[in-house]
Amino acid sequence: MTQAPRIQLLSPRLANQIAAGEVVERPASVIKELLENSLDSGAGRIEVDVEQGGVKLLRVRDDGCGIPPDDLPLALARHATSKIRDLEDLERVMSLGFRGEALASISSVSRLTLTSRTADASEAWQVETEGREMEARVQPAAHPVGTSVEVRDLFFNTPARRKFLRTEKTEFDHLQEVIKRLALARFDVAFHLRHNGKGVLALHQANDDSARARRVAAVCGPAFLEQALPIEIERNGLRLWGWVGLPTFSRSQADLQYFYVNGRMVRDKLVAHAVRQAYRDVLFNGRHPTFVLFLDVDPAVVDVNVHPTKHEVRFRDSRMVHDFLYGTLHRALGDVRPEDQLAAPASVAPMTQVSGLAAGEFAGQNEMSLSASVLERPQGETPAWRGAGAGYQAPRPASAGYTAEAQGAYREFFTPLPESAAAPLPASQDDVPPLGYALAQLKGVYILAENAQGMVLVDMHAAHERITYERLKTAMASEGLRGQPLLVPESIALSQREADCAEEHAQWFQMLGFELQRLGPETLAIRQIPSLLKQAEATQLVRDVLADLLEYGTSDRIQAHLNELLATMACHGAVRANRRLTLPEMNALLRDMEHTERSGQCNHGRPTWTQLGMDDLDKLFLRGR
């Protein structure tokens, strides 16, 4: 009979290396922990030196408060920290680090040197470790006020971990991404990065709106900021601010999404779900939204101690946070009008587009020129074109057919029109509506219009589809949902937790046209469904809705099914291709687009219009060269 192994304490070295497996995955993980310590120290400037993607050397130097010499050995001990003292501090954490594990874990898999000096000290002190259990030796050193941490030969004593590292470029790319995220979290701190002795990043302190906008443009690319909506709203103790990209500036990957809670970068499924809902019917299938958002909340209502790398958080009232995020973003996107999209040409950024750090855009950050609309969105009076489109009467174009008298027609083309036949011109540029006035129809599919910026091209079917869709949604919201009783109620077997959830949300289901009855601890009866969803699989829909309610505290599946049905109705009811429209009909469509929510995209997320400015047209014909 095999003897059972005895329980014994692990050695400090092995315990630290096990902890390092959670905290230290690659050089980017190390730089994250070191930068967070620098930010917590009150640093205003941080310098990072990297060699061989961070495997050979990682050095972080800051001008923070420094560490007293007596505390230096403790800084490398496990569970030793200056940031919390008791449980009450843990429940209201505002610092980025608080566990006291990072330096101990890093030092167990590398050769680490920590040098620091406080403002009241006459000299700096230094402590070193070499990835093994040893007595930390403190010695004097030369160093300005602040702290430097030098990490050499990462994973030198754990070769198995080192084998999992990627190429130097890949590891450095991950490291850059961490610095990008932290640079957006702290506009008041300057960041400088060098790789193999070459300067890569130079971000100066950004203490005003224009400087912050330049930093966002440097990190995310100028195109993002030109096509992003600045938002700021505060309600019920929650404050959300930042920039959300227009639906026309989407990505094929979720690589331009930055979200922060109290200055801490997080990747949270609740946040992702709320954002996905807000962009639901304005993004083309497979595309991802872009955003840089900051959520400020009372630290007591958010738990940051739920993940080894602190990437996830848990909110005390997750449903309130979810609804706040969704409602704010949904309204911001719904309020977008064509004039908001004219700051820059609409575009869909391809996955291969290089911007930010990879493109070296930081070097000229201070000289970066951004349009005034990016730095400060005007809040003027309602322009004169609002509501004025109905009175516009443009002349009917002559027939486009060719005749035998081509030469005569060609000469007649250059004959000036009589003054009475000319189209009425606006008194000033301010009187021109954002989408301008229609000029002609192309192949029965596109509308050509002229506005103050140049030429506008409109996909008339896509535009009319969105207008019809929004009207159907408004009508349904005002008239309510009609329920249709089932002749034979459907029985559905659930877990007791799901059945309890259905009973708790019975009134909510009723508002959406469902009537559910509890038959037993794990059984429900569906007695009524929305009349619009009579063809839907009611049992599976209820199951999916309950799963969402248990996961997120809310669900939009019923509304999504209804919207999908309305979108189909709008698609079939919209004006078809090859239908000839008169100029007044085209102008009426343009005016409707200017007053309709989300008119920049059809129900499937495709763009409904695009702008070709005079500069774009001049480039096509090589004018000005």
Swiss-Prot record:
<dbReference type="InterPro" id="IPR038973">
    <property type="entry name" value="MutL/Mlh/Pms-like"/>
</dbReference>
<dbReference type="InterPro" id="IPR013507">
    <property type="entry name" value="DNA_mismatch_S5_2-like"/>
</dbReference>
<dbReference type="Pfam" id="PF01119">
    <property type="entry name" value="DNA_mis_repair"/>
</dbReference>
<dbReference type="InterPro" id="IPR014721">
    <property type="entry name" value="Ribsml_uS5_D2-typ_fold_subgr"/>
</dbReference>
<keyword id="KW-0227">DNA damage</keyword>
<comment type="function">
    <text>This protein is involved in the repair of mismatches in DNA. It is required for dam-dependent methyl-directed DNA mismatch repair. May act as a 'molecular matchmaker', a protein that promotes the formation of a stable complex between two or more DNA-binding proteins in an ATP-dependent manner without itself being part of a final effector complex.</text>
</comment>
<dbReference type="GO" id="GO:0006298">
    <property type="term" value="P:mismatch repair"/>
</dbReference>
<dbReference type="InterPro" id="IPR014762">
    <property type="entry name" value="DNA_mismatch_repair_CS"/>
</dbReference>
<comment type="similarity">
    <text>Belongs to the DNA mismatch repair MutL/HexB family.</text>
</comment>
<dbReference type="InterPro" id="IPR002099">
    <property type="entry name" value="MutL/Mlh/PMS"/>
</dbReference>
<dbReference type="InterPro" id="IPR037198">
    <property type="entry name" value="MutL_C_sf"/>
</dbReference>
<keyword id="KW-0234">DNA repair</keyword>
<dbReference type="GO" id="GO:0032300">
    <property type="term" value="C:mismatch repair complex"/>
</dbReference>
<dbReference type="InterPro" id="IPR020568">
    <property type="entry name" value="Ribosomal_Su5_D2-typ_SF"/>
</dbReference>
<dbReference type="InterPro" id="IPR014790">
    <property type="entry name" value="MutL_C"/>
</dbReference>
<dbReference type="GO" id="GO:0005524">
    <property type="term" value="F:ATP binding"/>
</dbReference>
<dbReference type="Pfam" id="PF08676">
    <property type="entry name" value="MutL_C"/>
</dbReference>
<dbReference type="InterPro" id="IPR020667">
    <property type="entry name" value="DNA_mismatch_repair_MutL"/>
</dbReference>
<dbReference type="GO" id="GO:0016887">
    <property type="term" value="F:ATP hydrolysis activity"/>
</dbReference>
<dbReference type="InterPro" id="IPR042121">
    <property type="entry name" value="MutL_C_regsub"/>
</dbReference>
<dbReference type="InterPro" id="IPR036890">
    <property type="entry name" value="HATPase_C_sf"/>
</dbReference>
<dbReference type="InterPro" id="IPR042120">
    <property type="entry name" value="MutL_C_dimsub"/>
</dbReference>
<dbReference type="GO" id="GO:0030983">
    <property type="term" value="F:mismatched DNA binding"/>
</dbReference>
<protein>
    <recommendedName>
        <fullName>DNA mismatch repair protein MutL</fullName>
    </recommendedName>
</protein>
<dbReference type="GO" id="GO:0140664">
    <property type="term" value="F:ATP-dependent DNA damage sensor activity"/>
</dbReference>
<dbReference type="Pfam" id="PF13589">
    <property type="entry name" value="HATPase_c_3"/>
</dbReference>
